[in-house]
Amino acid sequence: MEDKCLIVILGATGDLTKKKLIPAIHNLVANKKIKDFAVVGVGRAHSNPKLILKKSKKYVEKLNKKTWSTLEKRMYYFQADFYDNIGFCKLEEFTKSIEKKHKLPGNRIFYLATLPSHFKAIADNLSRCGLTKEKIRRKQGFKKNWTKVVFEKPFGHDLKSAKKINKCIKKVFKEKQIYRIDHYLGKE
């Protein structure tokens, strides 16, 4: 990934973030796949970036101290309830301030490391508060930007619920923005 971007992890205090996402971001930075970035963890629990990173550290296989130091300087935490529209509007202001601080161009990846029951509320609040709107960010001075959203498996508990979730998120995002993944598919 050559583009500068902000990575927003919703569900930042959970196991997926601790065991998989933070170690993966560490590896991307260590392997020079991303250079100019920042990470905003979002969760309902009271936390902070230092605590999230501390809990993740033991899951990084080949810890690079310089990379870890970079991650410590570029990781932030924002407490918000996934069902609170006002909290998400404050998150928009927070993300803009982080993008400005790190001179990021408005490219955003939203990673929903949450239960599928939260997907609709999160997608609606991201959209309602302008967090995913590329056109709005262009008006704010970000020339050319993109938004991606990652939905982590399980994607519903059966076919009916998966279709319902898919219908909801397609009201908010274009198909080219959506990534549905299963991190276990890569395991041997």
Please provide the spans of the model-predicted regions.
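Secretory/organelle targeting and membrane-embedding segments
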Residues: 1-151, 155-188
